[in-house]
Amino acid sequence: MRKINSAFATLGLAVCLSASMASWGWGGQPIQNVNDAAIVSVKPLQVAQVKTAIMFAGTSLGWKMAEVGPGLIQGTLNLRKHTAVVDIPYSATKYSIVYKSSINLDEKDGHIHKNYNSWVQNLSNKIGGELLRP
């Protein structure tokens, strides 16, 4: 009986420690940027067309997109109490999606909330789809 109680105590301690680690922001995923994704299109595109595709893709997914300079868009996604901000540098041949900042996504030491990477991947997939439109 003592062994069983000891096992339950150990299990309880492990559960509490895991919960504490999660609340401290541990256990997040490494931030995955999209770096120099090649622009695939049925015909060569101008920089303005790439910009339009990126802006439309982001907006259609709920991102607020703003041109902050030539060849640079900033995307902001607000979901409930979470905010993700990315920089999207682009040219006629490639684009990137790079983590800039966040609120309530537990970013620390290059790791972040598990949902962040899927939001960025969805954005990249949507951009790719828009670039393929005739």
Identify the residue ranges that each predicted region occupies.
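N-terminal charge/polar-biased segments
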Residues: 2-3, 18-23, 130
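Bacterial N-terminal signal peptides that target proteins for export
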Residues: 1-12
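Bacterial N-terminal signal peptides
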Residues: 10-20
